[in-house]
Amino acid sequence: MNIQRETSGHIAAIVTILIWGTTFISTKVLLADFSPMEILFYRFLMGFIALILVRPNMIPFRNWRQELLFAGAGLFGVTLYFLLENIALTYTYASNVGMIVSIIPMITAVLAHFLLEGEKLRLTFLIGFISALIGLLLITFNGNVVLRLNPLGDIMAAGAALVFGGYSIFMKKLSAYEYHIIELTQRVFLYGLLFMVPALFLFDFHFDLSRFSSASNILNMLFLGIGASALCFATWNYSVGVLGAVKSSAYIYMVPVITIAASVLILHENMTWIALLGGALTLLGLYISELKPKAKLLENGCKMDA
């Protein structure tokens, strides 16, 4: 792989995670006036419009196989992931959801092992996963480990992790068609919004634009729609196409670390030594997961990846 291209893939993943790790601040503000379903719909509608304005060209229909991949990516990565996560939060503790969703990299690695060529599970990834998981446990429970299970909510959270892993597989397959990343993300958002429409009638959704008279609501929704949705899904999709589903997903380990840092810097919350240690172990896990396999020299002089 071209080093410059690989570096750009890592940078795209880091930019994505830096923004995703701070979205909780905007979501917290918006929840005072909007339901979770309303935030979800408006942010992706804004994101879709932004992508169309940036690049008006749309991918034409080619064949049903390709269209099913787009539909699957929209259903899994936009509609189901956020719906399942939001529903899970109403049935179980946020700490449970955070921990369960943090297994996305491992789920992605297992799915990629069986469904994608050239993306096999490696020992370094497993070691990195264990290190990151210990770190995330320290961050989430902060030394106060109390096992509080809620089967329905926890199953929903596990479902969210599973569908996001599936989304990465869909995006890796779609990257083979070499479409412009913005056009590709447009189509995924379009299907995500279409699949979201039935949910609008099932959940608490009110089409009340008066709430956008507040500058705070407008700015926070624009951040979620243009920054966290349009920009971040485009950069994430690019990263998956360049690095692969497994390497990209490992960056998800950073989300709780960034969330903790943002809480300290922006909300002036206290940082504990346990959370700091957890952050260090999580970043170590990410580093180990991203290590390249060493090349072994065969008897005939050819190289192979270990």
Curated annotation (Swiss-Prot):
InterPro entries assigned to the protein according to its UniProt record, in alphabetical order: AA-Vitamin_Transporters, EamA_dom
Alphabetically ordered keywords of this record: Cell membrane, Membrane, Repeat, Transmembrane, Transmembrane helix, Transport
Domain EamA: start-end pairs: 18-141, 162-291
Location in or out of the cell: Cell membrane
Residue stretches spanning the membrane: 11-31, 34-54, 68-88, 97-117, 123-143, 151-171, 188-208, 222-242, 248-268, 271-291
Disulfide bonds: none
Gene Ontology annotations for the cellular component aspect, listed alphabetically: plasma membrane
Signal peptide: none
Xref: Pfam families: EamA
Membrane disposition: Multi-pass membrane protein
Family: Belongs to the EamA transporter family.
Identification of the protein by name: Uncharacterized transporter YbhF
